[in-house]
Amino acid sequence: MSKKALCIISGGMDSTLCAYLAKKEGYEIIALHFDYEQRTQEKEKECFKQICKALKVEKSYILDVSFIKDIGGNALTDKSIDIPKNELCISDIPPITYVPFRNGIFLSIAGSLAEKENCESIFIGVVEEDGSGYPDCTDEFIQKAQEFINEGTSKNFKVCIKTPLVRLNKAKIVELALKENVPLELTWSCYESEDEACGECDSCLLRLRGFEKAGFKDKIKYKS
């Protein structure tokens, strides 16, 4: 029986690279995507499906967690709140694009699915550099989440949450992704647009800076 990993794939660079690294480690990948009615959900879902096809994933899940939008309080799900432009968050205070406890919600559900599918690992693409001010993107939080899942599941099930990118910056992530032949042109990072990336939101700026510092050109289309 092959070892299995549940890979949480948003459609972005980091989670996609994590899935490729899981495959390199010899895991059979079960892919998981969450629809929480964020602004770019349709584009992210399209990217997820293309990434699964590129990885030859045989089993995938797209789960509706739209109650996250009902909770609100963030610019990703509430279109009445403007997405900040041309400024990178460097504060310890969560930015308005922070979705409260999102990774906690995702990992709780992933833990349930991992137990059902008998996965020995969960891969999630959290990056501390990206998560400045995001309390659920730290290595400490992930370790606590792993303890929580293992405490709350059956005694004969133990899962390891793997975060291979947590200490890397965006340039290193781009370099590693290209080294591993990850099709970054299939990924999406923009918080606001689904046709052409805005090039101005926090996520676009981090992505563009990563490509620039790594010395490579991003192949996706940008408005600016």
From Swiss-Prot:
Under Enzyme Commission nomenclature, its number is 6.3.4.20
Which positions in this protein are listed as binding ATP? I9, S10, G11, G12, M13, D14, S15, T16, L17, C18, A19
Q: InterPro entries from the xrefs?
A: QueC, Rossmann-like_a/b/a_fold
Q: Which GO terms describe its biological process?
A: queuosine biosynthetic process
Cofactor binding mode and count: Binds 1 zinc ion per subunit.
Gene3D superfamilies this protein is in?
HUPs
Q: In which pathway does it act?
A: Purine metabolism; 7-cyano-7-deazaguanine biosynthesis
Keyword Magnesium in record? no
Keywords, alphabetical = ATP-binding, Ligase, Metal-binding, Nucleotide-binding, Queuosine biosynthesis, Zinc
Task: Give a GO molecular function annotation for the protein.
Answer: ligase activity, forming carbon-nitrogen bonds
Reactions the enzyme catalyzes: 7-carboxy-7-deazaguanine + NH4(+) + ATP = 7-cyano-7-deazaguanine + ADP + phosphate + H2O + H(+)
Query: Residues that bind Zn(2+), according to the entry?
Result: C190, C198, C201, C204
The family database entries (Pfam families) matched by this protein are listed as: QueC
- Which protein family is named in the record? Belongs to the QueC family.
Job description of the protein? Catalyzes the ATP-dependent conversion of 7-carboxy-7-deazaguanine (CDG) to 7-cyano-7-deazaguanine (preQ(0)).
- The protein in question is named 7-cyano-7-deazaguanine synthase
As recorded in Swiss-Prot or TrEMBL, the protein's gene is named queC
